Amino acid sequence: MFPFLKQRSRSVHGEDAPSSTESTVSVAAADIGGACTTLTVWRKSLLVSCEGFTVIDSNGDLIYRVDNYARTRPEELILMDKDGNSLLLMHRTKKITLVDSWGIYEANDTKGETKIPKCPTWYMRKNLKMNILSTKSDILAYVYSGSFDKKNSYIIKGSYRCKSCKIVHVPLNKTVVEIKRKEVRTKGVRFGSDVFDLVVNPGFDTGLAMALVLLLDQMFS
């Protein structure tokens, strides 16, 4: 569908390969195998009247989409599959607060209606120190397993503006997702910052990885 964005998934070799003694570092619908999944993320909706994202796999096929009709500070975002079915819903927890925070809910699409559980599966909070100009920190956000978990499961560090981020599983101190500037192999072709790679390790849900990208975009764009 998108041949100009087609690429091969990068395999895991050497020190990046998951150890057999390590526990699974993800949640739901995890990929199985020894290769990373590399998705191309395009910060553009397929609908003319919307802002959003288009996510493409290594074969150039549409995998995820986000169509946002609210052009300024949306309170809610929905990650959909290629057919427009809701997968994950992200809801801003408070409208007025110093710390930007979101709940991530599993969405069940029933007869065209999206049903949302009462409690979020995941909770993401922007690092408060990022709002203090005198303090430098490479940690962008913290990800918790639910809104009542006091200890974060993941940290996100790096620079979203430069499209250079890592999502690290805290208990294992292991990078499970990377956001990278898209590598160009064809001479004369250059992608802007709105097109980048999302590299997801086996054992981590690609849908959750994309949901975290959406929230980074809300917090740091």
Swiss-Prot record:
InterPro entries: LOR, LOR_sf, Tubby-like_C. It comes from the Eukaryota. Pfam families: LOR. Residues 1-20 are annotated as: Disordered. Gene3D superfamilies: LURP1-related (2.40.160.200). Belongs to the LOR family. Might be related to the phospholipid scramblase and tubby-like superfamily of membrane tethered transcription factors. This is Protein LURP-one-related 17. It comes from Arabidopsis thaliana.
